[in-house]
Each structure stands twice: as C-alpha cells, then as structure tokens.
C-alpha cells in the first residue's frame, strides 16, 4: 500500500509495526487504540468497526479504525480467539508534559498461548503455550499455562507423540527455535497444517530467573526447550512473572497412554459428534465446584496413573467422602465460595489484579477455616487433609480491613479503601464530605448578599464550580468581585475568589485521596504477591479435595463401585456399564454386561448384528479402565482389573479424509500402531477391522492381525468382526474366546436386540434385518433376502480346517470347488465400492446380482 509523506507519529508507528509484522498493533492515541493501514482494513472486517482514514483528502489516505481503550479487551479477545496476535502500544509519558513526539512502546504481546483470563470466572479450561525442540532423534516438549504458572516438560520419541501430547493439552500456539534442524524437519509446516499458531524465538538467554525455573531439570535438552519457552514469554509479556512454578519433568510412561483417536473414539472430554463437553465422559463426571478443580479433573482423566499405590490413595479419599455424606456436602458448600485461586494469584504476581479480584481472593480465603473445621470433624484421611490446608486468615483479614466490599473496577479513581483504614484518606474524605455543606452555605450567603433568590452554586466536569444567575439579574452582582466564566442563552456563570480557592482545595483533596488510595492498593497487592507460593499450594490442595469430593458425588449418583487392581493379568467386571450411554437412557433401560478375560484369555472375538451393542461393550471396558486408573470408582457391580500401560482403539469410522487418508488406510495405520507399540500390559479394541477393503482382503488381514496379536503381543484384546468365518480361530488358539451380542427373532420375523454378551459365536449377522430397521425400501430388502438365500444354498465357502495346506492357519477360503457362476458373482461383489454408491445404484447392482444367480 502506498504511503503518504510520513508524519513523526506514522514514522513511530511503522518502526513499531516492523518489529511485530504478524500482529495487530493497537496504537494508543489519547482515549483510543488506533489500527492503521492493513491492520485497520482487516480489523474493521473482523471486529465490525467503522473504517475511516487519516488525511482523507490526500492522494493516499491512511486507513484507520479506532477502539475505545476501556472496551479494548473485548476486541483483543475476539482477535486472539481467531488465532491472531495483538501488540499493545501505550503512551510512555504524559502527552501534556511531553516535549515533541510522545514516547510509545509495546507493553505486551497477546497471543493465543499467552491470553490471560480474569480469574473471576469459573473457567475450567487451561490455556497452554508450548515449545518443541528436535534433538538427537527425539523431541523435547515444554508447556506452560501463563494464567496459572504451571510449567512442565517431557521427552518424546516420535513426532506423532508430539502431536498427541499437543492435542491432549489443546495447545493453540507453538514456539520453535529458529535453527537448521527445526527447519529441515519441516516442523513448522506440519504443526501449522493442524491449525496451530507458530511463533519463533531467535535469542535464547539464560538469566537468573530462567536458571531458577529450569534448575530442577536434569536433561540438558529439556532445560533448553524450557528456556526457549521462557524467553518467548518474557519477551512478549514484559512484566513480572513471579507466579511461574519451577519446571517439572514428567514421564509419559508413568501414565496410561492413549492417542487422540482413542480420546475421540471414547468421547473422553468432548462428544465426537457435537464437539461439546456435554455427552462426554468428562461432562458426566465433572461435579467440581471450583475452576481449579475442573481443570485438575480433566488432567487426571487424560493422564490416568499406572502406580497402584497412587491410585488407591485417591480411591481411599473418595471412599472416605462416600462414608461421610454430610461432611462432603458441607465441604462442597464452602467450595462454592472459592474463586479461581490459581489465576487470582497469577494476576497479583503480574500486577494486573484489581480491587474486585482482591475481594474475590478474600472471600475464597475466608472459606478455608470452614473447610478445615468440616474436615477435622471427621476421622482418618479427611482429618489429615484438614491439617494440610493452610489457614490464610492473615491475608484475608488484611484485605477485609482495607478494601470495601463492592469496589469499582478501576483502581485509579478511588472509593477502594475502607473508612478508618488510613488517617490521611479519612482526612481527605472529611474535606470532600464537607463540600456540599460548604456549597449550600455559600449559595445561601450569596443570595442574601445579592438579593437574587434564584442564584445557584453548581459544578460540572468542564467548568468546575461556578455561580449561575439569570441574565435579568446580572446587574445586581457587585462589580469587580464576580469573574464571568460562561455565557448562556438565559444565564451567566461566574466565579469568585472564594469559590476558586474552594475548588483548588477540593481538587487537591480529591487528587491526594485517589493517589493515596492507589498507593495503598498497590501495597496490599504486593502483600498478596509476597504470598504467591502459599496461595498456589493452597489452590492445589483445594483443587484435589474438590475433584475427589466430586468423584464421590458421581459414584453415589451413578452407582459406581471401587475397583480392585491385581497383578494376575485378569479382567473380571460384573455388570459393567457404559456410563455416558446409561445417563442418556431412561432409568433401567441400559443392559449391563460382564467382562471376563482370565489369565488364559487374551482375546475375545465378538460377533453379532450391527446396532446390537458390540461397540458399546468395547467402549465401556475402555472407560472403566480409564476411570479406574485415574483413581475413580467405576460403573459396575464389581471390577477386578490389571494395570494397563496403553490403550489402542479402532472404533467407528473417523476417516482422515482431510489428510488424504481413506477408511482402510486409517484402519491399517491404527492397527499397525497397536502391533508395533502394544505390550502384554496393553488393551486393544478393534471394531470390525478390515471392512474398508474387498471381502477376501479384509478377512485375510483380519485373521493375520488376530494371529499376530496372539503370537507376539499377548495384549488383552476385544476384536469385533462381521466375518463369522473368523470364529473358527478360537478352535485353533487357546487364548482366543468367542462371544456374541445376543439377538432373537419373534414369530413375525422381527429382530429384537438383547444387548447381552453371550458365550460362543453368533449364528448369523442379521444384516438384512438391520437394513430394514434403517428404513431401506421393501423391494430392496426382498431382493437382498432372495440373494442371501441363494448364496446360503451354495456349497460352503469355508470348510472345516484341514491338516494340509497352511499348517498354522485356519483355511478361510477354498475357492477351487466354487462353480464358475458363483465365481463370477464373487468377482462382481469384489468390484463394488459401497462407500461411494447411491441408493439407486445399489438397487441396480442388486438386480444385476440377481440375474447372475439365475
């Protein structure tokens, strides 16, 4: 865009903009933030602002759009939520006293990963910023929630692990080091393809603060990636960040591992269809009362434990809460009064906490003595929890003594400090409180002296104090004593020496009062800041109690039981239930099922009609495992479980078409991940693997995968299939057992699903019945029934296994005995691509198949 001859202000703007080319520059001009040039054009569109121009009459006017400074935060949030960055440029000196161009500078760069919440809401969502560093054929990851101070780091083997971890954390912005290795690996492009905002850091400095925050880290590359992240934060935030907690390393091996596909397949934190929390497992189990508790619950759900002792510690507290119903209820009543302590502490550290947030902090801290009292009335573990909670009544008392209960949002306009807290403020307030009395007396005296009964003493922001008389009475005023200040249509306004002096005293008292109140507010906020570590420790303890009490609520409300963990590698679940599906159905409608895989059973082959409940059965096992290992009770009458290290799933058809992958490719990729990564301590759930390709290929691959898992992996596996021929594998492999989902036909031929898992294979799949239930045309159903009858009358396609041939394989196919007509029919079936076929095309194909049969 062509530019006009630049004014000093625009020179200053362009210098700043050149440093932040990828950000919207909010340039402070008086009471407004201005956007210029391309920022103004795009900003006006995104924010629905009026687009104007600077130097409108010039050949090249400069586009501009303005935002009132008091409303800027709303507009900033809109831009950042859309993935943009915003550089805030403030006036660094008073324009009234500045010589020449007012100095301005960027005071903060707000990005998707550094956006802060106010701390006054009930936000149960973390906002993580991460850095990734590739070194030595591994990936080092560090992430931080700037709004809470949480800082963690880990080492990952593969880039796919990085993607899974970033997805689990719901990271929006990634910081990368500008170096050759990062560039050569194309990491920026790979991450950008997934919708992440990419930021880069060139300089990496290790100052005293960085050294302190990375000191706990042993691995050099973990310290380096954390240093990159911290440098980016310090460069963009330009403020005190004393709330950041020294970095903690974590090992993924310490937690039950599962990838994004599994999280999606199981609806763990969001419903796969609606993308909302409602309808997910998290939505069901979140009965937390605080924002910190909500965030911690989600972290526990996404990182179930593998240490039995740690799991049982959580279960012990839940059980104690179950046994102490009234204690739990009273505790939760107190928790409802607790605001977001983590984020309030962070805002105090960063110097952004206002007076209202101080009051929120006071109310939160004031709830702690009640919580301690309630817990101490119990015995054992809850009593011990009471002793760990720190009573911070000293800080709450200071805030209560100093700050009014309902302060204004602004901290610079006074009315924040309580009467009686400070003698100077009381003195100034006394002067101000006498103002109205003094003005009333002046008005009375002036009326008596002038004889003008309509004379009034008034005040407004533009002219201050003045005496107003009607124009008809101006002649009654004593000459030389009254100084004209303003002429109106029907009146004149004057000031007197006494009124001028009074205004000076009032303004001085007002100014000194607000300055003194601000000074005291900052002092109190600094006292809060000095207690950051105490507040953060207290916040963690309160969050844990909130989560455990919430899980006790969930257990009571949903008939969950405490699981038992064993080293015997068995799964023994009595009347297990899918908690989310059960919650949707009417009471008593959900059909519970046992899940039994003993030491001699590694795999269940599950057959039965579509819609009968195979997928639900598989999902409920995974959810019970995850709930149990996160330290929660589980939906069953009883549950004995091993400790799993990983869960692999292929359930549903969440095709990655956007990444150019078909259903079958996704199936094979997910199967390969399990084959390569699973151990004997893993859980594998494969739902109808092989359906995405031709029948023979799919069946052959399914059998090969089953036998590979049995021979080499030995993981506990649920494998559902519509290939009924595969059920013969149970006769060959002792660790494979057949089960099926029951269904019965009534006398009229109508199909009824029992939703019960029964021993042995299903006798048939009832696919045509399911098609009829789906509403396919009667003519089509009749044709399909005829075709099926004809196929079933043909010679068996899968004879009994023979000793000859594939000595270690179950012979699924013996096509040498198939007559030519049937072979032609098979070839035609193999050529059909049902995923792209329209209903009309399906009818035509069925008609053609019927002709081939005749």
Curated annotation (Swiss-Prot):
GO terms for molecular function: ATP binding; ATP-dependent DNA damage sensor activity; damaged DNA binding; mismatched DNA binding. Keywords: ATP-binding, DNA damage, DNA repair, DNA-binding, Nucleotide-binding. One of its GO terms (cellular component) is cytosol. CDD domains: ABC_MutS1. Signal peptide: none annotated. It comes from the Bacteria. ATP binds at residues 608-615. The keyword Transferase does not apply. GO terms for biological process: mismatch repair. This protein is involved in the repair of mismatches in DNA. It is possible that it carries out the mismatch recognition step. This protein has a weak ATPase activity. PANTHER family: DNA MISMATCH REPAIR PROTEIN MSH1, MITOCHONDRIAL, DNA MISMATCH REPAIR PROTEIN MUTS FAMILY MEMBER. Belongs to the DNA mismatch repair MutS family. This is DNA mismatch repair protein MutS. It comes from Leuconostoc mesenteroides subsp. mesenteroides (strain ATCC 8293 / DSM 20343 / BCRC 11652 / CCM 1803 / JCM 6124 / NCDO 523 / NBRC 100496 / NCIMB 8023 / NCTC 12954 / NRRL B-1118 / 37Y). The gene is mutS.
